[in-house]
Amino acid sequence: MSHTPKSAGSSHAPVNSQTALVIGAIGVVFGDIGTSPLYTLKEAFSPHYGLTPDHDTVLGILSLVFWALMLVVTLKYVTAIMRADNDGEGGIMALTALAQRTLPGGSRSMYVVGILGIFGASLFFGDGVITPAISVLSAVEGLEVAAPKLEPFVVPITLVVLSMLFLAQRFGTERVGKAFGPITLLWFFALGAIGVYNMARAPEVLHALNPWWGVRFFAQHNWHAVFVLGAVVLAVTGGEALYADMGHFGAKAIRRSWQFVVLPMLTLTYLGQGALVLRNPAAVSNPFYEAVPEWALYPMIVLATAATVIASQALITGAYSVASQAMQLGYIPRMHIRHTSHSTIGQIYVPAVNWCLLALVAVAVIGFGDSASLATAYGVSVTGTMLITTVLMIIYARANPRVPAPLLWLFALVFLAVDCAFFYANIIKFLDGAWFPLLLGLILFTLMRTWRRGRKLLHDEIRKDGIKLDTFLPGLMLAPPVRVPGTAVFLTADPMVVPHALMHNLKHNKVLHERNVFLTVETLQVPYAAAGKRLKIDAIGDEFYRVHVRFGFMETPDVPLALMRSCDQGGIYFDPMDTTYFASRETIVASANRGMPIWRDKLFALMHRNAAPATGFFRIPGNRLVELGAQVEI
């Protein structure tokens, strides 16, 4: 995903800029929800739910789909949740930070909100595995309609398409990304045209817009109707992307895209599929492709495959973005991040995330085999994330004096009921496939919690055994070691304690540099650090300095650049060719008698050993770096 400056999404942006943002948003934000028509109605009438495609049932399902789009996407996300932005950024991590700000620091409620945010992000990655698999598989399954003899080749073709997609990530998407918007726009207009084509033959399908048919469906099917919501929710998968990508395109462009293009075209295509089923109930086997005129079938398969690849690309890029934020906020180990664009901020490639996603997507395609089986696994991660988002929004809005209490209660009652119903409808499919994304989410949640807890234990252990800087320096200056020319920068997590690297340097080299800097890097709970608050320099005597550098969680930390700019703010001048960076690299020793169970200690030690060095993460040049080892028991 490319990062668009916030001003681009403002009401004062030029018309051409707004149009470009709208088209860009259609290509990136709405790819997931735009490919849902490939499988939603097909899944609703699958044998799994035992529904007969008669007149009342078809209108009932269509009514539920339409009003799910209106309630969940239009009212919840577009109208309400997109108002909660963290300096223009959206997404579950940003909302977690907003909700935590309304709570007392260090309180149990703040801790619980953090846990909710981590679990929501974990479910997002589970969604990131299922979405490419089900989307591309559904598109390629059109070959079964066009040429049934090609059925055995559907899975291999899907794997080839997905492999090419993931292999191409390392080259970036800046060039081809410009075509995403127009292609997806063409896709939506094709959906609308096919919908109108079929509606003209059964205009009575328009009755489904009346919510009475949805209510009637519940009255006729009782609790079984709740079970069917597991298929209806497939129509709103991708709704979370509207909020997550708000910082890239601006709320205005996303709202316009939804109101004037995406919602109308989705409504037309679902009604068109319903009209076809009313005329030909046998078409429920694959209502999307059965609704396409025979002459347009192969072009539609190609367009659908392109649309699903674009939807998958948007989600993959989103996974990189969330991973980068999680690294910055200290929830997962540092990984190598490669910037794939010289001109566009936010175009990144994270190899570890890419290859993990490819392996898991391939497992999903091979293990489930078809889109119908994958659909049973799909909804639980999406609905879990939607439910957590609602809870976080309620916590945040509760502290906002501009939100009237009756309105907040209404929001809470309506959307907690809707989200809980959708989540329940999917969680009861646990043995049918819902276990897969939940297992992925649980594994990632465990990794994130272990890393977070392990880092705290490591920090506490270093601080416990450390020497206070304020008492160490006066003693050192009583018998000062030999001073050598240049500047030494010691990276430390705790600015009040003597860094291990300094102790080792004195012990083995017996020298001090002319100027010594104790550098602490902090990631803020906002996307971008304010220019005036990025750097703080305290002189503590005898050419020793305590420097605090702050970055937002959406920024790429560049420590040398931040230090070089210090003189612009009246600070000291750093000559990059005269500066040596010192860092300690801890070796973790697991202990059964400390803070975590031994298996989590060993897991943390493994993660720590394989994490990318902080020096590379902070853009510190290798030829100016000295790393010194230290063994720490946790």
Swiss-Prot record:
Reaction(s) the record says it catalyses: K(+)(in) + H(+)(in) = K(+)(out) + H(+)(out)
Transmembrane segments: 21-41, 58-78, 110-130, 147-167, 179-199, 223-243, 258-278, 296-316, 348-368, 377-397, 403-423, 427-447
Pfam family, one: K_trans
GO MF: potassium ion transmembrane transporter activity; symporter activity
Keywords (A to Z) from UniProt: Cell inner membrane, Cell membrane, Ion transport, Membrane, Potassium, Potassium transport, Symport, Transmembrane, Transmembrane helix, Transport
Keyword Transmembrane helix recorded: yes
HAMAP family recorded: Kup
Family: Belongs to the HAK/KUP transporter (TC 2.A.72) family.
Membrane topology field: Multi-pass membrane protein
Protein's cellular compartments: Cell inner membrane
GO cellular component, one term: plasma membrane
Annotated function: Transport of potassium into the cell. Likely operates as a K(+):H(+) symporter.
Keyword Cell membrane recorded: yes
Protein name per Swiss-Prot or TrEMBL: Probable potassium transport system protein Kup
